């Protein structure tokens, strides 16, 4: 990784962490249970656009995340994807590149954040849970770290 990207990652991680700590009174419970090494899939509920960066800044290790490709249309979200090495998924077809990239990352002992709902508040919208987490665990033996994201609707509360 180049030095500029490293510096950007530190700056952006710090900014997001401080923002969440001050505005949303961020509290992490059970951080001692997060594996320090080996492939890990952070499996969480998906409530807002802040969820992927929130996992990234609280995990204590580098975490990539899967995201719908349409997010690259927003310059800020595209920038976050670049900084945190997002894996973009084309959701409207049977694209295999994202699967291969994720498998390779997990086999290289990297960590990935995934949201089985497949979209924000998917279960509330009647969506079914996607099978991606189970597929990647069976293929790679990655550990699953459950993530529950609560609150965030009302800043400063």
Residue ranges and their predicted role:
Residues 5-8, 13, 20-157:
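Soluble catalytic domains of membrane acyltransferases
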Residues 1-3:
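Short, Lys/Arg-rich, polar N-terminal cytosolic tail immediately upstream
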């Amino acid at each position: 990784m180049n030095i500029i990207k490293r510096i950007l990652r530190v700056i952006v991680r710090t900014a997001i962490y401080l923002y969440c700590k001050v505005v949303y009174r961020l509290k992490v419970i059970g951080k001692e249970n997060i594996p320090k090494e080996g492939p890990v899939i952070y499996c969480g509920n998906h409530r807002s656009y802040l969820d992927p960066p929130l996992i990234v800044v609280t995990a204590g290790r580098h975490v990539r995340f899967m995201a719908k490709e349409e997010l690259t249309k927003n310059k800020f979200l595209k920038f976050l994807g670049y900084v945190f090495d997002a894996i973009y998924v084309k959701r409207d077809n049977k694209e295999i590149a994202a699967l291969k990239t994720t498998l390779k990352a997990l086999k290289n002992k990297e960590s990935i954040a995934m949201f089985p709902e497949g979209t924000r508040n998917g279960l509330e919208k009647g969506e079914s849970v996607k099978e991606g987490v189970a597929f990647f665990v069976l293929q790679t033996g990655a550990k699953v770290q459950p993530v529950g994201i609560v609150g965030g609707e009302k800043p400063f509360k």
